């Protein structure tokens, strides 16, 4: 199943007054596996502080929040919820391509080369989906 979806807040008391809607860009679901993808486009895919490239904090907080709230929906049932920040590739020397395990969930950061024929872009997206289905193999470029 591939779709954009709303992710409910995991509220202890059920009171969600003034909380924003969590809307994923893409959610892939297959059996007990879920991959939430948030697509981003920036002139700079990383931020630089003190000559060190780091991920945009707000983006990482956002995908982590989506994943942890979706993860809580499963309760004690066997499941795997992962998240991915998917950036459009820029001409910068540093391009994010990392996977982290955070509080029991896989969070990946990838770049997508949009400077290709559509068939190559489709191949990159298919590689992401296949990697998700088969233990997260790395996705290729054009």
What is each PLM-predicted segment?
Residues 1-142:
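Catalytic core segments in nucleotide and nucleic-acid processing enzymes
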């Amino acid at each position: 199943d591939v779709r954009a979806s709303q992710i409910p807040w995991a509220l202890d008391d059920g009171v969600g007054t003034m909380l924003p809607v969590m809307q994923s860009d893409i959610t892939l679901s297959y059996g007990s596996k879920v991959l939430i993808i948030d697509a981003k486009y920036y002139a700079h895919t990383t931020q630089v502080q003190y000559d060190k490239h780091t991920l945009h904090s707000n983006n990482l907080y956002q995908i982590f929040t989506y994943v942890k709230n979706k993860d809580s929906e499963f309760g004690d049932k066997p499941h795997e919820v992962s998240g991915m920040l998917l950036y459009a590739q820029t001409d910068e020397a540093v391009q994010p391509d990392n996977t982290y395990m955070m509080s029991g969930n896989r969070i990946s950061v990838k770049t997508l080369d949009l400077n290709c024929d559509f068939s190559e872009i489709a191949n990159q997206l298919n590689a992401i989906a296949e990697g998700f289905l088969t233990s997260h193999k790395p996705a290729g470029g054009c």
